[in-house]
Amino acid sequence: MKRFTAILLTGMMIFTLASCGKKAQDTPTEPATETQAAEKVEMPTETEAVTEVVTEAAKETQQTEAQQEEQTAEQPDEEQNNSGDNNSSYQYVERASYENGESVSLNPSWQYADHSAINSGCAVMYKATANRKNIVVGVNAGHGTSGGTSVKTLCHPDGSAKTTGGTTGAGATKAVAVSGGMSFNDGTPESSVTLRMAQILKDKLLAAGYDVLMVRDGSDVQLDNVARTVICNNAADCHIALHWDGDGLSYDKGCFYISVPGGIKGMEPVASHWQQHDALGASLIEGLRAHGAKINGNGSMAIDLTQTSYSTVPSVDV
């Protein structure tokens, strides 16, 4: 998992947002402030700056990984016992290889693929043309699946209930396959803004030598949240989902990432990866902070997400 440290802060260097966050609820927000913020996204142009910040993030995260590896070596039996029966179906997989421009569909043999309800669409792989780092960043433009609210999928692979609220309330065992997201007061849907963000992020990542798996490469993709996550699990080294927060506020409350709540940290595959999820999110937020973006509170909000519950690579909603 060392490779994921190199991309921890690449994303944060590339998109400086005025407001982004948890799975957006269908609550309208003030348009002028947020829409203008989307148009004024500032992009760094110096490769040296990107390299410097990525290196700083890598050092911090490598320390976290080293601590995890040391703990695992010291207490293998205890961790195995704590995982329980849920761990028996968990699988580590090698990243699948795809050519530039190749469509990436959901392989029904992939772990958790059978939990998906909408999966006829495809992601698209883009390869950097120079200074390639052999790292694939999964970029997920939130929402943008027509019919996504008409079907539901299991919140957790093991069928257990959600432990926190969100778009779907705590205690539910199923959630809408893909929520519709919020709308700005001028009528612009969240999915349009997240797509533009994803396109900008893709271009900057490619220019910096990172390959990009565009989970949604157009206005609509027939891939639900489970399918998007499973595809990233198998074709990317990390998974970054972009969102705007439907909070109804008329001011910019700042950026934050969705951290993993304690209630699901013992469930696989979360148990094996939640520290990496949170490390990725924290690094993105600290990078945004360093480049002048407003941060909401401590920069995180713990929410039980479908994406996190199914992720086997470092994964975060921002």
Ranges and model annotations:
Residues 4, 14, 21-61, 65-318:
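Catalytic-site microenvironment of enzymes
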